[in-house]
């Protein structure tokens, strides 16, 4: 009795997972994925504005051919507070929207290029006064990664303006549609 219950539960879990998973590239194939993202700021962005960031993305992929994929990505990142001294700190956060593509060089390995907008919100906290500001910036993420059986891992260099760049590392899963 217990063994048949275990087998039934495994079938109920594994069979749908196998059919929904494996969002792989290919002609006219669609997938929807979710990624966790870790962002490490570089240059002036790290020196004056942000600590380590974290967030997530949702990505739609449409297969243009056996190696090329069009992508549409939306996500949110929040960086840790940066102490500016004299009792002041700043904490940026951003909502992003990107359009671009991936090219699968070999089975599973890809290079990606996207472009889009970062809607950035800065929160300043001081001893006497606090302030909040918003700005919109153009972003150009250039990356590499590996995708197999729906699972995806990647690294991107995020070009934001001239001095506000970061490395981002992603880990996620893609569901075939």
What are these regions (language model features)?
Residues 1-5, 22:
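Positively charged n-region of N-terminal signal peptides that target proteins for export
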Residues 7-16:
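Bacterial N-terminal signal peptides
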Residues 20-71, 77, 158, 167-168, ...:
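Short glycine/proline- and aromatic-enriched beta-strand/turn motifs that initiate or cap beta-hairpins
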Residues 28-32, 48-56, 91-95, 134-140, ...:
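Residues that define the transmembrane beta-barrel architecture of outer-membrane proteins
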Residues 34-38, 56-62, 76, 97-103, ...:
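Residues on the lipid-exposed face of transmembrane beta-strands in outer-membrane beta-barrel proteins
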Residues 44-51, 82-90, 122-131, 163-170:
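Outer-membrane beta-barrel translocator domains and adjoining extracellular loop/strand segments
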Residues 66-70, 108-111, 148-154, 177:
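Repeated loop/turn-to-beta-strand initiation elements of outer-membrane beta-barrel proteins
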Residues 75-92, 112-122, 154:
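Outer-membrane beta-barrel translocator/channel fold
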